[in-house]
Amino acid sequence: GILADDMGLGKTLQMLTFLLSEKEEGKTGDELRTLIVTPASLVYNWKKEIGQFVPELSCKVITGNAAERQEMIQNEEDRDIWITSYDLLKRDIACYENIRFANQVIDEAQYIKNHGTQAAKSVRLIQSGFRMALTGTPMENRLSELWSIFDFLMPGFLYGYQGFREKFEEAIMNDRDEEVSARLRSMVHPFILRRLKKDVLTELPDKIEKTVTIELEGEQRKLYDA
């Protein structure tokens, strides 16, 4: 499913708590092995939070040069959680060919919103049982972004992309078809867990949003149109 809580509501900690519960139920080795794929800037944040909140879970960061990473990947029995970045997963994907993970987590899942990118293709190639996507923005601009995440989670659930376009995207985006939109919501709703700050932090004042429209000028317009 998609854990889509607002930023700051603890998606990382919720995921780690789930993995700890799996270990406490007696799962080890192949039954527990988890691959976490995250932007490079967050790799060591995951490692830090594992050590701080769930030290019972062992982890390793796939890092180093190509040969060092290959050796770490081939030594598959030594840690509960493996952490790598989207970029390194693309480079190392062949090394994962014969490895199966019980769980696969993709953080900042908007990184795979374009289903044709190498990042999106790589996470799909990993052999894994339970899959989870973490993102506060499962869809930013186009319905195809939502399809791409679901195609990672449950391939075929929203059909192939061409089928999705014909059954949902064109009717919703071009015709504003409310019936089709409601049907899509009913399909994806059970698999999206989302809390907003306003729902859980009642002591905070409401956020005030103001939209200001401005015109792009000069170099800004040239860069935007490029």
Name every feature range the model reports, one short phrase each.
Residues 181-183:
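Long, charge-dense, solvent-exposed interaction surfaces that engage phosphate-rich ligands
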Residues 1-176, 185-226:
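ASCE P-loop NTPase motor core, strongest for the SF2 helicase catalytic module
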